[in-house]
Amino acid sequence: MARTALLTVGRFPAALTLARGLHEHGVRVVVADPMKRQLCSVSRAVAKTFQVAPPNTDIAGWERDILDIIERENVTDLIPTSEEVCHVANLAPRLTKTARYVGPSAEWITQWHDKLAFVNYAISRGVTAPSVYTTADGEARALIRQTECVLKPRRGCSGTEVSFIPPGSTLPPPSQDILLQRRVQGNHLYTLSWVDAGEVKATASYRGSTHSGTVAIGFQSAPTPFSVKQWIEQFVADTGVTGFLSFDFILDRSGIPWGIECNPRLSSGVHFIEEAWLGAAVMGEASGSPSISPAGKRAQWSYSTLTEAYKHLFRFQIPELIRCLRDLFVSRDAVWSWRDPLPFILMTPLCWEFIWRSIRERIPIGDASQCDIAWHWFKPGFQQEFRQETPEETAIMPRGNEREA
């Protein structure tokens, strides 16, 4: 039987890469997104696109829209591609037996997406993660007296509201939603893993080569150290999870990987996995070893890289400008394809909705692109108000206990 995959956001390059991989494997791909026009809407890999209600302001409408698309389009596979994974996981128990949800369950999302609960879980699995506390915890004051720290939202994404503070700094008002974490000095490494029934089938590692704020827009493939492979395998073992898992690591001077956060979803590492293998793997039909780009291969979002280059030029930041230009001229564009050119050609008008939101509301473009779908901007109580399921079926972010790594 022919399979139809529904991607629940299509505005990002990672979703486009996944759509192309699924299409190459013979899967019919449809996309739902609160944006009327987005990258996937003009792709040859996508059969249909649907504009749906934004889940952060109309969760009930969004759920109705997704369930309606699943029924009308005979969707066999429901696949989240970005921060909307939290909403999709909550919806998954309501799917019929003919539709498969591809991603972590709400139970796992609550433990992995929450940056405090993530550290608790990682330590319980015997892997390394730096100590973290809410600013309401007395231990946070002791920590900032001892060492440099990172201040960040408990459910943030895309580097939102992240700041580094020196020892002895004054903490912001106590909050259960703001975290203070020990800063680990070392080299950053990002990973994307495809996990099937709790078994890691492929991992692509990469580093950011060009950044817009704290968000990487240029990427360089990197080898995956054995210690990182072990860390990921130990983290997901016995979970039974099938889906994409992304991790941010810092490797200290001893080579020890410290897990900073988990994004239980697709990420830019997908640009370093062969599309044909990727599409087959997501459908549970892959054979042979995954094809991962060799270390040193580069990819970029060239429009974003060019924007950063202009910014550095106007600010006379010559070293940063040179780095941007190097990426611009030597890196493969993650969106461009001779067989599917329109997403690249039309990228600026297709992204105009959140570009304009960024200008109008004076917020970073990363925030503007996520604020209608990501849990960082979602009020959990709002979902309880509209959902008809029992409380046990609704994922609630836990208030975990702080633990030292």
Residue ranges of predicted features:
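ATP-binding N-terminal substructure of ATP-dependent carboxylate-amine bond-forming enzymes
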Residues: 1-103, 398
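Conserved metal-phosphate-binding beta-hairpin within the catalytic cores
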Residues: 237-272
